[in-house]
Amino acid sequence: LAVLREYSCNAVDAHTEAGVNRPIEVTLPSRLSLELKIRDYGMGLSEQDIQEIYAFYGESTKRKSNSLIGQLGLGSKSAFAYGDNFVINSFHNGVKTTYNAYIDPSQIGQIAKLASASSNEANGVEIVISVKPSDCETFVSTARTLFTHFKVKPIVRGVADFTYETRTPLY
């Protein structure tokens, strides 16, 4: 599933940009919790960054570096290929801000700021996507294959006994 790949690679890029060596965190969906969560510990995003990156197709902050995976400005919108909304939690300079990215009635992507509060959490971004019950196992099997290729393996939560396939890392 593209959403898992795109947001996980964006999280890896956020760590690369910020010089962070810790793994990204991924919570896989299960029948008990129908949410996919991908959390990075990069620099976080300001409100202006959120609007520019998530609301406009082709907008990318990564074109000036060859060390980053993404550069086309499409991956941050990939959740719209799966559903009509998703949540963005940005942890930026001591503030957690929650946004809802959604497709409006005219089929245009919009960003709504839902809440903002002081936070002691480390900077970064968390993407939360509601998942169909029938897709839970597909996300788990996709994660097993995808994350095998990551040099720094993500911390995976949400499922018991998660194991990676054995292959040579690409990222």
Which residues does each predicted region cover?
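A broad, low-specificity signal for short, low-complexity segments enriched in glycine/proline
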Residues: 1, 46-51, 88-92
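Alpha-helical scaffold elements adjacent to nucleotide-binding pockets in ATP/GTP-utilizing enzyme cores
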Residues: 7, 49-56, 81-82, 142-146
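Conserved beta-strand-loop-beta-strand hairpin that lines the nucleotide-binding pocket
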Residues: 12-65, 99, 105-107
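Hydrophobic (often cysteine-bearing) scaffold residues that line and stabilize catalytic clefts
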Residues: 4, 46, 139
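Solvent-exposed, well-ordered amphipathic alpha-helical segments
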Residues: 8, 12, 32-37, 85, ...
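GHKL-type ATPase core
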Residues: 65-169
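Conserved ATP-binding N-box helix of the HATPase_c
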Residues: 1-25, 75-82
